[in-house]
Regions:
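Extracellular/periplasmic carbohydrate-active domains that bind, remodel
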Residues: 1-178
Length: 178
């Protein structure tokens, strides 16, 4: 239930798991940060926006072994409601998984999202929308995005797809992100 949260002008290096995880936040700003994670670490996400509203991420540089920026609604935090009114702008990202991801954990609504003026370089997958659970994804705009993908290895998620979209249901009993 944090309101008016600001994370600005910091550098974080070599996070072993999700670096910044906003849960149930309202009116958050992440601006001018650098996240320099090891590109060989799985699940080393950069920024995860989870059940949060009115979030702006701007002017960031993110290197991550997993998702650089991920919007989601995880089951264990459903009391915080949906993820909506998100703006990501002027960011540069490199990932061995998916630089920009919506899902795959989505038990609620992800709505009114803008990704604008971003560069994705040397990533195994550029943009991914993985709506594998009962939630919905709507009103998402990608504008002025440069995507440069490279295939790295079968051990990483993705095969150098600039854009990947799936609504294939998660396996019964599997509630883990994949």
């Amino acid at each position: 239930n944090a309101e008016k949260t600001v994370i600005r002008d910091i550098t974080i290096r070599n996070s072993a798991y999700w670096t910044i995880h906003l849960i149930g936040c309202y009116d958050a700003l992440i601006d001018g940060i650098s996240l320099l994670n090891n590109l060989k670490i799985r699940n080393g996400d950069g920024i995860d926006v989870d059940h949060s509203k009115k979030v702006r991420i701007a002017n960031c540089f993110i290197e991550s072994g997993d998702d650089c920026i991920c919007l989601k609604n995880r089951r264990e935090f459903e009391e915080y409601g949906s993820c909506e009114d998100i703006v990501v702008t002027n960011c540069v990202m490199t990932s061995r998984s998916c630089a920009i991801k919506i899902g795959s954990e989505n038990m609620d609504k992800i709505d009114n999202v803008l990704f604008n003026n971003c560069i994705i370089k040397n990533s195994n997958r550029g943009i991914g929308i993985q709506n594998r659970d009962e939630g919905t994804v709507s009103n998402v705009i990608f504008s002025n995005i440069l995507v440069d993908c490279m295939f790295y290895s079968d051990v990483w998620w993705g095969k150098a797809e600039p854009i990947y979209v799936t609504s294939y249901p998660r396996a019964v009993g599997n509630h883990k992100d994949a």
